[in-house]
Amino acid sequence: MRRKTLFSGLLLFLLTCSSLTAGPAGTATPGLVDSPLAHTFSIVAIDQESGEMGVAVQSHWFSVGPVVPWAEPGVGAIATQSLVNISYGPLGLALLKGGKSASDVVKELTAGDNGRDYRQLAVVDAHGGVATWTGSLCIPEAGHITGKDYSVQANMMLRGTVWPAMAKAFEVARGPLAERMLAALEAAQEQGGDIRGRQSAAILVVRAVASDQPWNDKLVDLRVEDSEHPLVELRRLLQVHRAYEHMNAGDLAVEKGDFEIALKEYSTAESLNSDNPEMPFWHAVSLANVGRVDDSLPVFARAFHQGGKNWRELARRLPEVKLLTV
């Protein structure tokens, strides 16, 4: 009977929280019933040397990518999680864009939210400011660590060692920001991660200084929507993404007629994603275009073997558009 009474009380409490509550600057913020249950672990960070900033997250929740991570070039990056107030993402970016610091944003967003004790929020601004909030009613184990240029945060974890392990992994990792943030997520999973398990993950990286070409300012945007091993799949996707960065660089070199540079880029791409016929095909085209026809033949053969007859037909069409010049 006592358990039934407790359950009824909890249900009544949740139902009374279902209406919208006043939020920052007079906006409406969702009540608890409207909040996705994205209990999770995440990292927000900025690399001031490379000029990158972003968010990475894993959760036992379907398609966490549209919910938790938010970032805008030249503005900042935000993770909103636990019983998620999704409005923290766009509202927080708007506040940053208006000149507020990361600390100001966290204070303003949580101050106007009646459900703040259930929220977890982390913000990094384009100047390297970092601020985090972990509500007192986030499901244990829950906590965060704010370090130089980053914050790691987690809730509903199996162990309280998750976020310290994330911080350590990020601090010792080397390489691009996306790979360093992924290392932090992997360290969290090694500590047991979410007590419920794992399902989805995402990485979002943008430029810390916006350029006059906004289409080039989102550097990484990868999501694993539903997987038994989302971080394994996310790492695979990140490697494929890096391969295609080199493919894109190769394509640009071809446009400029710089086939030697194209050759280097396509070769690197193939080494990163050797099972995709796209990589050896354009590698072979570049070899042929710099006069290394004999070297191109086995690479063409590999592409044709992987991709089938359509790739042979594609090769036949390239001379007429001057992309195969031999």
Model-inferred region functions:
Residues 269, 302-303:
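Canonical positions in the second alpha-helix
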Residues 23-245, 256:
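N-terminal nucleophile
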